Amino acid sequence: MSAEQHAPNKRQRELLDKHLELVIEENKVTNLTRIVDWESAQVLHVEDSLAGLPEVEEALEGPYLDMGSGAGFPGIPLAIMTGRETLLADSVGKKTRALDSFAAELGIDDIVSTYHGRIEDLSLQQPNHFSLVTARALSSLASLLERASPLLAKGGRLVCYKTHSESEELEHAREIARKLGMEFVSSRGFTLSDGETSRAIIVFRKR
């Protein structure tokens, strides 16, 4: 699918911009992000979140979990673009309360909800439940696999947003994946529109 086919329509762009406005405003009272100027945030938060759309759209239909959602990236942009039932999980109550407020303000609280707590506890409450899990700059690939695998349904995908992809880390993650009943699907590196920020999208699937 081409970049044009992944581009937001007018309504989606309005919601993406509104979300970013809400984040910048809320950041004055709640520490959500260190990136607060509009242009940088558009690239490093919004564009970065949407960069995973090709991989996200290959996932099976079904509920979506964003681990360590923070300010709602990539969870809210991906919910806006895909319309998936979305759960934004974070261990910090101030952040999940802000995310609830964002979803209500954006009018997407019919598909977006939050979970305040540890991912390990969520996996006990909703095992094998999610068709898609995302994690953005959160932890090592091996750690993400260990957290996500109990939550994923058979055939479900873990889409990892990384600042870079090191072959040694990926090889170790592939070994861990096999032990967890997961398998490596793909790795794609790219540069954001600022011309200097490198990113990688790495995907695993539950067998």
Segments (PLM) and residue ranges:
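Conserved S-adenosyl-L-methionine
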Residues: 66-70
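Conserved SAM-binding loop of SAM-dependent methyltransferases across substrates and taxa
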Residues: 71-83
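Residues at the C-terminal ends
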Residues: 25, 80-81, 153
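S-adenosylmethionine
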Residues: 75-77, 87, 91-207
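A short, structure-level motif marking secondary-structure boundaries and short turns
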Residues: 4-9, 84-86, 157-159
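Class I SAM-dependent transferase core
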Residues: 1-65, 94-97, 101-110
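Residue-level detector of structured alpha->beta connecting loops
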Residues: 60-61, 83, 181
